[in-house]
Amino acid sequence: MTETRFSKDHEWVRLDGDVATVGITDHAQSALGDVVFVELPETGRHVDAGEACAVVESVKAASDVYAPLAGTVTEANGALADDPGMVNAQAESGAWFFRMTLDDRAAFDALLTADDYQAFLATL
């Protein structure tokens, strides 16, 4: 069963078994504008929760993408390098940034639910 959670840094995490898929939220891509470049983390890299591990550049700004959880990157979405505009079109589906195995499954449960994330957005 897959479940999606969110960070206050506007990343989403979809957990499927032991694998977490990470991307940026629709809110984040909308704030960035047209995405023109994406830099992804290397496979095999260990990241800590809150660590900047990817970069997304738009016509407006460049922004770090933070690891919402600690773990090891197992795959990066190379399609984003060829077509960074996917981030705008499919932010919370096909335009995932990387997949990782988690150091601590319980940390996933501490992230925001969809309802909690929407409530957080309302405070911005």
Curated annotation (Swiss-Prot):
Entry cofactors: (R)-lipoate
Keyword Amino-acid biosynthesis assigned: no
An annotated GO cellular component of this protein is: cytosol
Start and end residues of each Lipoyl-binding domain: 19-101
Q: Cross-referenced InterPro entries, in alphabetical order?
A: 2-oxoA_DH_lipoyl-BS, Biotin_lipoyl, GCV_H, GCV_H/Fam206, GCV_H_sub, Single_hybrid_motif
Q: Which domain of life is it from?
A: Bacteria
Keywords annotated in UniProt: Lipoyl
Member of which family?
Belongs to the GcvH family.
- Write down what this protein is called: Glycine cleavage system H protein
Which organism's genome codes for this protein? Acidiphilium cryptum (strain JF-5)
Task: Specify the taxonomic lineage.
Answer: Bacteria, Pseudomonadati, Pseudomonadota, Alphaproteobacteria, Acetobacterales
